Regions:
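Nucleotide-state-sensitive switch-loop elements of NTP-binding domains
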Residues: 1-71, 83, 94
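Residue-level signature of catalytic and energy-coupling elements of molecular machines
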Residues: 5, 56, 103, 118, ...
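Amphipathic alpha-helical transducer elements in NTP-driven molecular machines
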Residues: 9, 32-35, 39, 55, ...
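Conserved C-terminal guanine-recognition region of P-loop GTPase G domains, centered on the G4
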Residues: 60-73, 77-129
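Canonical P-loop GTPase G-domain recognition
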Residues: 99, 107-164
């Protein structure tokens, strides 16, 4: 995992505690990772050729959308606490993403958040975006997300990074 934040190693430490190799990249006043940072991170991590590299960019919905990091699949993560209109407010990241993960769904009983409206907004911006609703607290929806990852990782086309991620489908 390459973990990007402006400051701290908090998230990298949490990831590392699971046994996963992680490199922290702090951008200081910068609002995103760039390809050169990813290249340096990969050189430091030295992942095996058949491994999966996950990149968590700096946590905003504007700057990271503007930079190609060479990823095969782009995933945008949206918490239900942020409001269902985020895909309309920040369309560029949703337009470029292959997947939207809607998180913290265990909080829905306590919020005024319209899941269907959020998904509709995301689909208006990007009709091909796949949506997974998950809760890290309860585990709800994680099997579907893991299934997506497993399918793509074991797919022969996974080895071909030139193939568009939108061409594979379960």
């Amino acid at each position: 995992v390459i973990e990007g934040d402006q400051e701290t190693t908090n998230d990298a430490q949490k990831i590392q505690s699971t046994g996963c190799k992680v490199i922290q990249i702090n951008t200081g006043t910068g609002c995103h990772l760039d390809a050169a940072m990813i290249e340096r991170g990969i050189q430091e991590l030295q992942p095996p050729l058949d491994s999966v590299l996950m990149i968590e960019n700096v946590g905003n919905l504007v700057c990271p959308a503007l930079f190609d990091l060479g990823e095969q699949t782009k995933v945008v993560i949206l918490s239900v606490t942020e409001g269902e209109d985020k895909p309309m407010k920040y369309p560029h990241i949703f337009r470029l993403s292959d997947v939207m993960i809607l998180t913290k769904i265990d909080l829905l009983p306590y919020l005024q958040f319209d899941v269907e409206k959020c998904i509709d907004y995301a689909k208006k911006v990007n009709p091909h975006i796949r949506v997974y609703q998950v809760s890290a607290t309860t585990g709800a929806g994680l099997d579907d997300w893991y299934g997506f990852l497993s399918y793509h990782i074991t797919s022969p086309s996974f080895k071909n990074t030139l193939e568009s991620p939108s061409t594979y489908d379960r």
